[in-house]
């Protein structure tokens, strides 16, 4: 098992949630209103000087589903190069 961890701009929330559900993922955890800075886009700190916020989506999936999810993120990054999409995967040792 892996933990798929996706950081994305809040203004893409409806689309991301819809795509995830259409792909068959009914169970996930969403953290809304996160802030951060990266090296490819402007910071999203929720302030007048760095407006905007991110959301985080976490999905526990079998290893073989990770390539499909990563390809979805690659497509979003191609379609929206300044969007600020970032995906991470982690080994998931246990889920209770």
Task: Report each predicted region and the residues it spans.
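Positively charged, small/polar-rich N-terminal and surface patches that mediate targeting and assembly
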Residues: 1-96
């Amino acid at each position: 098992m892996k933990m798929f961890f996706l950081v994305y701009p809040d203004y893409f929330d409806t689309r991301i949630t819809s795509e995830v559900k259409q792909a068959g993922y009914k169970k996930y955890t969403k953290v809304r209103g996160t802030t951060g800075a990266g090296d490819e886009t402007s910071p999203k700190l929720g302030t007048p000087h760095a407006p905007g916020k991110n959301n985080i989506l976490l999905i526990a999936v079998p290893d073989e589903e990770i390539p499909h999810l990563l390809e979805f993120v690659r497509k979003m990054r191609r379609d929206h190069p300044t969007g600020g999409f970032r995906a991470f995967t982690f080994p998931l040792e246990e889920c209770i």
